[in-house]
Amino acid sequence: MGSGAHAVKLEGVDGHEDVIRHIVGSGVPVMGHIGLTPQSVHQLGGFRVQGKTGEQADHLVRQARVLEDLGCFAVVVECVPATVGARITEAVSIPTIGIGAGPATDGQVLVLSDLLGIESRVPRFARRYMDGASLVTDALNQYAADVKDARFPTCAESYS
């Protein structure tokens, strides 16, 4: 693709089937995204677990099947009970990539700032692998002190 992208990820299914079909038919690989869809979070009532009732879970399974039928090469499954993540994974032959969808999905993804501990609030499904907030704060304080005390920039950080 001209911009250097290798695929697009589209959130949601319902009402967008023709768009997805057209994009896939145009030769652009599409990854679907179901469950919690951050771009529509306000329509979903905020950052809340999706698929908690049997009816909601069944709907998510149907959405995953529709995405597969439309030609999506994979589907992100976000913020659903682990049992629902497993059901979706069993229901489709395309890879499922979980983010807060339990251990049974085919792959996993985390938001980098959650993984690195940059934000003070971490979603329940994320694990911090470092205290990035402290490291960033320390680096910013050191930078400010170096500028204030004329230790930055030096000739080494300047063009001649």
Regions found by a protein language model. Give the residues of each.
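Alpha/beta enzyme core
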Residues: M1-M130, S134-S160
